[in-house]
């Protein structure tokens, strides 16, 4: 996970290549900067936005983006596990799943892009935490069940979200190996995001 290693997912600099931009944001449910977020999304202009910790107020604020992102799927909750996908492209067979717990939703859908269809999973499993879950058992179960399912999917598949894990953990290693997915961070960097108030070296 440093630039010294060969990249696992190559970059495409060819102008004829179709480039898609996916932005994932754990917005922090108590964050009140909803309209600043909307403004930032308009500026960044990703093709897809996956939002985590979405409650009803955040979901309502995102209606301002509907003209640009007419296709959505999600479930807003007030327990820090609401999830929402906004897309410029049509979504098909969209489902909200509860792989391990009824109050921990994930997204499973197909995205149609210029006649081609890819599979998308948006996830936010519960982390091990003294205040939430004393062990990583539920998180690990969700990720490994998903990996087992993905390995049999023939379509191009994307998994995005907040996995509440570090890339060097045994669970992360097994998830990548079992699913057959590639990690775009390999050869580029850790891109650690927590805590965003700290310098990168301390995350």
Residue ranges of predicted features:
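Active-site beta-strand/loop signature of hydrolases that rely on acidic residues for catalysis
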Residues: 22-27, 37-61, 120-123, 142-175
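Active site of divalent-metal-dependent phosphoester/diester hydrolases
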Residues: 70-85, 103, 165-203
């Amino acid at each position: 996970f440093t630039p010294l290693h060969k990249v696992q997912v190559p970059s495409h600099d060819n102008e004829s290549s179709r480039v898609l931009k996916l932005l994932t944001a754990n917005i922090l449910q108590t964050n009140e900067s909803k309209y600043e977020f909307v403004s930032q999304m308009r500026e960044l202009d990703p093709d897809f936005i996956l939002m985590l910790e979405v409650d009803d107020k955040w979901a309502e604020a995102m209606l301002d983006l509907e003209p640009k992102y007419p296709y959505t799927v999600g479930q807003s909750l007030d327990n820090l596990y609401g999830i929402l996908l906004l897309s410029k492209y049509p979504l098909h067979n969209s489902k909200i799943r509860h792989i391990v717990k009824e109050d921990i939703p994930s997204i499973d859908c197909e995205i149609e892009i210029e006649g081609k269809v890819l599979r998308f999973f948006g996830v936010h499993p519960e982390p091990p935490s003294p205040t939430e879950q004393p062990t990583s058992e539920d998180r690990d179960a969700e990720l490994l069940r998903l990996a087992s399912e993905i390995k049999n999917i023939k379509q191009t598949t994307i998994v995005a979200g907040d996995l509440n894990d570090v890339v060097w953990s045994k669970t992360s290693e097994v998830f990548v190996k079992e699913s057959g997915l590639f990690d775009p961070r390999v050869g580029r960097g850790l891109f650690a995001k927590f805590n965003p108030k700290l310098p990168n070296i301390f995350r």
